[in-house]
Every structure is written in C-alpha cells, then in structure tokens.
C-alpha cells in the first residue's frame, strides 16, 4: 500500500530524532522538512480546498486571540485530501509517532476535534495558547499535536511563524516558518504554549494552509494531570 509518506524514511527519522525530541526546549518537539513525499505534498496543495469551494468552514473570529477558518467535515473533502488524513491516522503512522515521542498506546481521533484543515488569511492570527487537554467524546487525554504546512513560496515578512513559548507563557523560545511540506510535532500538555500571534501580512486572497492532527491516550503521567480544560489563551485565561 502506498502512503503519502515514505514509511522507511519516517521510521529512520523516529530513531534519529527521538533523543532530540525528548530533550527539545521549551517542551518536546521536532521540526521535519520534506515530511511527505514530494508528489503527495504537491497533490495535497493542489487539492486543498479554498474558502469558497463549497465546503462548510467553521469561522473563528475572536479578536486578538483567534482569526481563522477550519473544517473537519471529511465527508465534504476531495478524495485525495480524505485519503491523506486517513494515512495520518493509520497504524504505521501512529507507530512512527510512538517511536519518535516515546509515548505508548497512542490512538487517532476519527472526529478530528479542533483539527483537520486550517486556513488563515490576511490579518488572521492564533494567539499564544495551550490546547484543550481532554476529548470528551473519546474520553481520552490529548498527547500529541501534528501540523503539516502547505504554503508554497512563503515569505518571512508574512509574519506567520509558529511560535513555541516557555511553559510559563512568558517568552517565545522558538519560531518556525510554516513553509511547504514542513511538519511540526510536539507533546501536548496544559503548558505547551504556542501560536502565531501577529496578524498575517499576506497578499489579499492568499492563505496560510495547514493540516492539524491530534493523538490521544487513555492515561497520562501523573505529573501532567490537570482537570479537563478548554483552550487557554495568554492574555485571556492567564497573563
């Protein structure tokens, strides 16, 4: 079976990057370029739905905290996009994530709560935040975030870098350009603060495109346990 990724390459990447992942600051993460095969990444870009393609997009317009559109309604997706998402929820891919992160017993979210396809346009942003930690339908702990970017000819002056912040939400520790076929994987906790907080300076009609997928376990380490909470924004839920 052909996947959108090169499985042998991914498995080697997991072995090579596992130590760097667990030791990364401000929290465990890795940035992987050329994540999907070149052909698959190009096909995803070509088939990535636009804002007016007849798909239901959820609108997020909370000024200063989140301005974007997103959808997880896979029944409306082009077949190629739907198949790509299924590959990212497949057994071989989850085994890669387990090897990379050291987190066992991961499973995918078929509902893609909060995930799926994301589009952010001119003046859009995503404030610095820590994600919700509990999936009420799966009754499971959120453990891993995966973002893959599909932004050809991206320029630094667009101001769309993903920022990873310190666990006290005081300082930006790392900035990551959302360039084409780059993946960012990180461990999700109640203090894994991140976002792209500056309004995008994109040309009118251009978008910051990404696929976001999240992975879960039924248990998590005791030192990470907190009561279930929704997304926590710096400046709204904490200073």
Model-flagged regions — what are they?
Residues 1-25, 230-239:
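Fe(II)/2-oxoglutarate
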Residues 133-142, 151-239:
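Catalytic core of Fe(II)/2-oxoglutarate
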Residues 5, 9, 18-101:
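Non-heme Fe(II)/2-oxoglutarate
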Residues 145-147:
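Eukaryotic charged/polar low-complexity linker/IDR segments
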Residues 29, 129, 194-196:
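Histidine-centered active-site/metal-ligand motif
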């Amino acid at each position: 079976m052909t996947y959108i990724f090169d499985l042998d390459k991914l498995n080697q990447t997991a072995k090579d990057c596992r130590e760097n992942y667990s030791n990364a600051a401000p929290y465990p993460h890795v940035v992987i370029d050329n994540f999907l095969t070149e052909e698959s990444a190009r096909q995803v870009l070509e088939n990535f739905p636009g804002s007016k393609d007849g798909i239901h997009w959820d609108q997020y317009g909370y000024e200063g905290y989140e301005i974007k559109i997103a959808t997880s309604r896979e029944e409306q997706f082009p077949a190629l996009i739907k198949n790509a998402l299924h590959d990212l929820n497949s057994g071989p891919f989850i085994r890669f994530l387990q090897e990379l992160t050291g987190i066992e017993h991961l499973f995918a979210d078929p509902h893609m709560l909060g995930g799926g396809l994301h589009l952010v346009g001119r003046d859009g942003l995503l404030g610095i935040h820590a994600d919700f930690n509990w999936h009420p339908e799966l009754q499971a702990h959120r453990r891993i975030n995966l973002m893959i970017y599909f932004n050809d000819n991206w320029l630094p002056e667009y101001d769309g870098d993903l920022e990873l912040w310190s666990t006290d939400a005081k300082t930006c520790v790392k900035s990551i350009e959302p360039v084409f076929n780059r993946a960012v994987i990180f461990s999700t906790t109640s203090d894994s603060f991140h976002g792209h907080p500056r309004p995008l300076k994109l040309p009118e009609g251009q978008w910051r495109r990404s696929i976001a997928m999240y992975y879960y376990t039924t248990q998590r380490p005791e030192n990470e346990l907190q009561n279930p909470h929704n997304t926590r924004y710096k400046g709204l839920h904490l200073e």
